[in-house]
């Protein structure tokens, strides 16, 4: 179990940020309540200080690239090689965490709105308009490589031929910096830039994500310094134990309509 494993590893808290939904939140809160009761009883018996385990309510939202009300099935863009491709309109990833009851209520409003018929396209989507309406009480993090900020950094790097270049060079990361300023202006001190580093030596495992993280992370850190935004290191956890990896891989294939042996899935 996620909570038990976290406690075993000495972690004081964990955030549950399921993709696009909050279905697991009640189960998390109920389980933490029972667990904290047991931890308190154990602390009293041993005469030690009781430190409750903290569940953090959140979601990894899909933020539409433009408006959640637009469904541009054939929207195209051009990559660094000059080839046109269909833009995925399901949205960038964005982490939202409730820091108080107002934040929890706003999180519920945002997620509920994302499932409405006019918002849903492939996935439940939010947009900047929703964030402007319901940002109070929320902590916002830039998310994984699927987030708007990392994606715009990668676009800047691609335009430069894949080299990091000079952070301060004009227009190199202009879109990324505009993204930072927009979220910083909205969330203030509650906006964080995430860095992740998921290295694996397991045979057959995908090494591409780690390679990209190594390229993007230094840019994230430098831009965070430049714009006075705090950096937080996170783990993009999708299963508890290593032996669960295969089952998770099968689940991903089901959700993305792919086969295990598909290339470039």
Model feature map: region roles:
Residues 1-265:
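Phosphodiester-processing cores and adjacent nucleic acid-binding clamps
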